[in-house]
Regions:
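ATP/NTP phosphate-donor binding region
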Residues: 1-86, 175, 199
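General structural feature for long, well-ordered alpha-helical segments within catalytic domains
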Residues: 39, 65-68, 115, 166, ...
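Predominant activation on well-ordered alpha-helical scaffold segments within soluble catalytic domains
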Residues: 70-73, 171, 175, 185-189, ...
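Acidic-aromatic/histidine active-site loop/patch
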Residues: 93
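Catalytic nucleophile loop
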Residues: 96
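A glycine/threonine-rich phosphate-anchoring loop and its flanking beta-alpha core
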Residues: 101-196
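Active-site segments that bind and position negatively charged phosphate/pyrophosphate groups
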Residues: 191-223
Length: 223
């Protein structure tokens, strides 16, 4: 399945458009306890969200496990999800990884949309179709490759992040800059992390995602 990445300027209209292309009888939103508080209020104001079922799991990567996965399956089941339902994964890489795996396995697969809320998830985790959970003390030990229908990147969510989370994503962008153009690298190293310009960062995120997409195209299953 081809994944479409949208650099958002009008999140509500872009989400409405994406949902119109995702067959769904019911809509679900997966958050963790952090994004439920910091990010979900933005979506709750959208008309297209008025009947959405919200499923919330504990935050942090330590909860990217079978217990949280079962919580999502249970939430989908109790909410009456069918094979024709759709789930939005709203959060960082933990949410997009686990949510993608849950959606890919529930009813043998339902549509899902990723709306990453961390810089690292925007330029890496949410793009490329890798989904999964930690198991037996090992990271990402169980999972599948399955693309979300859409990835919607809205850099406004980055206002909710602390410096450590911004730096984590920026480090991944630097890796992309090293294997891309000199111009991209120079813009990255001169970017002011202390006073980030969100419009400039939005463009840089788009450039970084293009590098990630080229990597995935060359080796989609990390052979």
């Amino acid at each position: 399945m081809e994944q479409r990445v949208i650099i958002s300027t009008q999140l509500e209209s872009e989400l409405v458009s994406a949902l119109s292309e995702c067959e769904h009888d019911k809509l679900f939103v997966l958050t963790d306890t952090t994004t439920l508080e910091l990010c979900m209020p933005v979506l709750q104001n959208f008309y297209c969200m008025k009947e959405a079922h919200i499923i919330t799991i504990p935050a942090t990567d330590s909860h990217k496990d079978i217990d949280s996965l079962m919580m999502v399956w249970k939430g989908l089941q109790e909410g009456g999800a069918s094979r024709h339902s759709c789930m939005i994964n709203l959060g960082g890489g933990m949410v997009t990884d686990l949510g993608g795996f849950a959606a890919s396995t529930f009813k043998r697969g339902i549509n899902f949309i990723n709306i990453p809320t961390t810089l690292l998830a925007m330029v890496d985790a949410s793009v490329g179709g890798k989904t999964g959970i930690n198991f037996g003390g090992l990271k990402n030990e169980v999972g599948v490759f399955n693309d979300s229908k859409f990835v919607i990147l809205d850099t406004e969510f980055l206002k909710t992040l602390d410096a450590e989370n911004i730096c984590s994503g920026y480090a991944e962008m630097l890796k992309h800059g090293l294997i891309s153009t000199e111009a991209m690298w120079e813009e990255l190293v001169s970017f002011d992390l202390d006073k980030p310009d969100l419009k400039q960062l939005q463009r840089m995120v788009g450039d970084s995602v293009k590098v990630k997409e080229r990597i995935v195209e060359q080796d989609p299953h990390e052979q």
